[in-house]
Amino acid sequence: MSIEFTVPLRRRWTRALGIAAMGLAAMVMAGCASHYIDGATKEVNASMFKKPAAPAPVQVLFEFETKGVSNTRATDALKKQVVEQVRASGLFSATDEKPAASGALLGIKLNNVPMSDDAFSKGFATGLTFGLAGSQVSDGYICTVNYVAPGKKPVVKVVRHAIHTTMGAAATPGNSTKAKDINEAVNTMVRQIVGNALNDLSHDPAFN
């Protein structure tokens, strides 16, 4: 899935996400910003997942939050991408937003938070690029995957990621990859953070 951004759409997307850093919102809407995907969270392909011997159907519920508050517009913008990624994972026999015959439920929550928040920084002591300076701001993202199968305890996995944005002559953020635009940055971040969470889930003995 790809979400295309003309300048007006970029403005609407920024408002929809409720970007945690107001400086980032201003940069994006100005149309002259550079966006970088943090390199601490790597790409994980579905081929690396540990596939269950007998995959079961699952209901997928996705929600995007901005600083812990439900963001309906951003949820709607990203839901298809996330559900399709789960469907292509090979971890389940069938994937739907409606209740599954097995009763299994996979909840995926993606929370956009300032990287200075305790909820973000305490869970990521190393890896992400801090020490921001000049016209550079960063948004943190926390992906929480919660898998619940009938008669079993929930299996929860949490992964963190970030998008860095610079404007003008600001130095390139270290350990990051430049995206061509905010569209590519957001879609790549979502794909990577969800992929890592699904990979962690697949290797948990409680899931398999």
Question: Residue locations for each model-derived region?
Answer:
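A structural "domain/chain start" motif
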Residues: 32-91, 202-208
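A short, hydrophobic beta-strand-centered structural micro-motif
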Residues: 57-62, 98-116, 190
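C-terminal/domain-edge helix-coil "capping" segments
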Residues: 40-44, 138-142, 154-208
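Bacterial N-terminal signal peptides that target proteins for export
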Residues: 2-21
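A short, structured loop/turn motif at beta-sheet edges
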Residues: 52-55, 98-108, 144-156
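Compositionally biased, charge-rich terminal segments
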Residues: 19-22, 106-118, 165-167
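Surface-exposed short loop/turn segments
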Residues: 109-154
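C-terminal motif of bacterial Sec signal peptides marking the signal peptidase cleavage site
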Residues: 27-31
